[in-house]
């Protein structure tokens, strides 16, 4: 008896839509924040590691009109959804998609920017949907191996941007510094003024640099905060 295939809820943004397909990877606030926060210049070659349904790649395509974006994922249902989302966007000529593990991926060039919403569950707990388990279990792509591979794939002036829960993010940053990376940007994110920091947005550089630190509160007493609205207004329909 075949298991029931669960459709993942889609999401409509101002300039593109996300079809979830059977990916098990719904649009998340983490992903939207990272895609809106990442620093690039228009001509950059960008690599999106673990693209899922293609959200980060599409956000970068919208924000940086001349950027060439390469997206990878190891999960075939994610690739199928991302392929549809890329084809339906106005930037399909600047988006390339590869069904590949980044550890085995051999591009023809290095990248100026890498963007990644990495797996972070270390507890071994299993998801009800195997695709989401693949997307989120650290043993699929160990953070140390991810950092090493990012270092190899970046140009000397390149940077890599990530979003993680605070505990995993602090551990990831510590590991990166031990491996010779430099922390160029760090944003601490709170759900609201009364709740503690729960996410870190951060950018790692290969070259020595000062760290630019900022703070973001998502919700105010009246809804989304002004800072969150300013960050994401190019994307969310009701901003």
Swiss-Prot record:
One of its GO terms (molecular function) is tRNA (adenine-N6)-methyltransferase activity. GO terms for cellular component: cytoplasm. Pfam families: MTS. It is found in: Cytoplasm. Gene3D superfamilies: Vaccinia Virus protein VP39. It catalyses: adenosine(37) in tRNA1(Val) + S-adenosyl-L-methionine = N(6)-methyladenosine(37) in tRNA1(Val) + S-adenosyl-L-homocysteine + H(+). GO terms for biological process: methylation; tRNA processing. Its EC number is 2.1.1.223. InterPro entries: DNA_methylase_N6_adenine_CS, SAM-dependent_MTases_sf, Small_mtfrase_dom, tRNA_Adenine-N(6)_MTase, tRNA_adenine-N6_MeTrfase. Keywords: Cytoplasm, Methyltransferase, S-adenosyl-L-methionine, Transferase, tRNA processing. CDD domains: AdoMet_MTases. Its main location: cytoplasm. It comes from the Bacteria. The keyword Methyltransferase applies. Belongs to the methyltransferase superfamily. tRNA (adenine-N(6)-)-methyltransferase family. Specifically methylates the adenine in position 37 of tRNA(1)(Val) (anticodon cmo5UAC). This is tRNA1(Val) (adenine(37)-N6)-methyltransferase.
């Amino acid at each position: 008896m075949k298991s029931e295939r669960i459709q993942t809820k889609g999401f409509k943004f101002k300039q593109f839509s996300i079809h979830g397909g059977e990916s098990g990877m719904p649009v998340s606030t983490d992903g939207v924040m990272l895609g809106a926060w990442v620093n690039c210049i228009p001509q950059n070659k960008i690599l999106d590691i673990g693209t899922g349904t293609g959200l980060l790649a599409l956000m970068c395509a919208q924000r940086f009109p001349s950027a060439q974006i390469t997206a990878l994922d190891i999960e075939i249902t994610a690739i199928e959804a991302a392929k549809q989302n890329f084809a339906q966007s106005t930037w399909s000529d600047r988006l390339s998609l590869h069904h590949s593990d980044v550890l085995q991926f051999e591009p023809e060039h290095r990248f100026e920017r890498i963007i990644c919403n990495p797996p972070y569950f270390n507890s071994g707990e299993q998801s009800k949907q195997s695709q989401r388990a693949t997307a989120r279990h650290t043993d699929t792509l160990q953070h140390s191996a991810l950092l090493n591979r990012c270092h190899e794939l970046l140009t000397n002036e390149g940077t890599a941007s990530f979003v993680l829960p605070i505990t995993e993010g602090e551990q990831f940053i510590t590991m990166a510094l031990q491996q010779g990376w430099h922390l160029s940007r760090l944003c601490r994110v709170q759900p609201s003024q009364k709740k503690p920091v729960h996410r870190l947005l951060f950018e790692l550089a290969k070259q020595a640099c000062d760290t630019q630190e900022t703070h973001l509160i998502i919700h105010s007493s009246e809804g989304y905060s002004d800072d969150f609205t300013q960050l994401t207004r190019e994307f969310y329909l009701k901003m």
